[in-house]
Amino acid sequence: MTKQIYIFNPEHDLCIANGDENFVPPRSASGFARENRDLSEYLKRPNKQSRQIIPWGWNPSLKKRLINEGVDPAILPSEDELQFIRTHSRREFALDVHSRLNCVHPQVIGPDYRIVASSVSEIEEFISANGSAVLKSPLSGSGKGIRFVRESLTESDAGWCRRTLNKQSSVIVERRFEIIKECAMLFECHHEGIDFVGYSLFESRNGAYSKNILASNEDIEEIIAGYIPRETLITTREEVKRILTDALVGHYEGFLGVDQIICQAASPVLVPVSEINLRMTMGLIARNQYDRSLLLIHEET
């Protein structure tokens, strides 16, 4: 097989949200990519993908950049593939996957904790019924596009909602939970199906990624099992994999992460599909780094 080339383009979420191939990311985002280009080494792992180029994430801006650098367009994703990625990067896809889960358990939150609102009045009704809420734009990046609301919309909140509705046609409105742990299931999608790659355990602040915990899959599963029954976690994983297989195989090739939340209620509960990222994640980098370090230790001993 031809040697694969990995590209670390963390500005991907901003590019996919904008959608324009001529979009120029903010200097801070492009600067972060340049300063941390060595992280591309930790994107590498055995995979079943057919493409020679494997980026953090595919978007029109990256495709145009590569073509301008002389890459043959024939080895890059088609316009239809890029549109599929953008459509399924919207938060509505996570809600759709959640609603199709056949996993009924008292410690697994159902999909009705959030709605896809198409008007400010819908948003206000949800907040009135549920109190504190989280507002999310369908497409956003790096913690942007997320607002936390208590009891009612401020003028600033309402203005943000109107702008988001005008630009992206909807706003995701969620009940706000007390978060105990944040984790993710990592997968690889290829032409033969979807493989489970591993778990990720991470922390965020105000919706923006903060850090990952380096640990084995077994240790992370043990930590999660301290709150949620292990069999429930495994059933959820297989259900998520089944639904993603139906939705993605044949249309998307690459890695993806399904973010999950363990929340405090009468007893700990699992939000099984909080976000879906059709790209690589920092959790995958952490998984690769841990697994590679473990391999080196075994080789030395």
Where are these regions (language model features)?
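Extreme N-terminal starter segment of soluble prokaryotic enzymes
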Residues: 1-4
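Conserved N-proximal alpha/beta basic substrate-recognition cap immediately N-terminal to
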Residues: 10-17, 29-129
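Extended active-site and interfacial segments that coordinate phosphate-rich ligands
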Residues: 31, 197-220, 279-281, 288-298
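Conserved ATP-binding module of the ATP-grasp superfamily
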Residues: 108-111, 133-135, 149-179, 243-246
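Glycine-rich phosphate-binding loop of ATP-grasp-fold ATP-dependent ligases
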Residues: 112-114, 133-158, 182-184, 206-224
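Phosphate-binding site of ATP-dependent enzymes
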Residues: 156-211, 257, 261-273
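A conserved active-site cap/scaffold subdomain adjacent to cofactor or substrate pockets
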Residues: 198-251
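ATP-dependent carboxylate activation and anion-phosphoryl transfer catalytic cores
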Residues: 232-301
